[in-house]
């Protein structure tokens, strides 16, 4: 396995994990907001 650009792979990995983190925060924020506003 030849890795021509490991930096590009790290950037893609960080971007994907960032999107998953934002999605997780959004999913957790919906029931919490409903709980606080009710």
Curated annotation (Swiss-Prot):
The record's annotation in InterPro entries points to: PSII_PsbL, PSII_PsbL_sf
Query: Sorted alphabetically, which Pfam families does this protein's record hold?
Result: PsbL
Transmembrane segments in this chain: where? 17-37
Query: What is one process in the GO biological process aspect for this record?
Result: photosynthesis
Keyword Cytoplasm appears in the UniProt entry: no
- Which superkingdom? Eukaryota
Which keywords does UniProt give here?
A: Chloroplast, Membrane, Photosynthesis, Photosystem II, Plastid, Reaction center, Thylakoid, Transmembrane, Transmembrane helix
The UniProt record lists the keyword Repeat: no
Can you supply one Gene Ontology CC term for this chain's record? photosystem II reaction center
Query: How does the entry describe its membrane topology?
Result: Single-pass membrane protein
Q: What is its subcellular localisation? A: Plastid, Chloroplast thylakoid membrane
Quaternary structure (record): PSII is composed of 1 copy each of membrane proteins PsbA, PsbB, PsbC, PsbD, PsbE, PsbF, PsbH, PsbI, PsbJ, PsbK, PsbL, PsbM, PsbT, PsbX, PsbY, PsbZ, Psb30/Ycf12, at least 3 peripheral proteins of the oxygen-evolving complex and a large number of cofactors. It forms dimeric complexes.
Task: Give the family, as the similarity comment puts it.
Answer: Belongs to the PsbL family.
> What biological function has been recorded for the protein in this entry?
One of the components of the core complex of photosystem II (PSII). PSII is a light-driven water:plastoquinone oxidoreductase that uses light energy to abstract electrons from H(2)O, generating O(2) and a proton gradient subsequently used for ATP formation. It consists of a core antenna complex that captures photons, and an electron transfer chain that converts photonic excitation into a charge separation. This subunit is found at the monomer-monomer interface and is required for correct PSII assembly and/or dimerization.
- By what name is this protein known? Photosystem II reaction center protein L
Give the species.
Cedrus deodara
Taxonomy, top ranks, is: Eukaryota, Viridiplantae, Streptophyta, Embryophyta, Tracheophyta
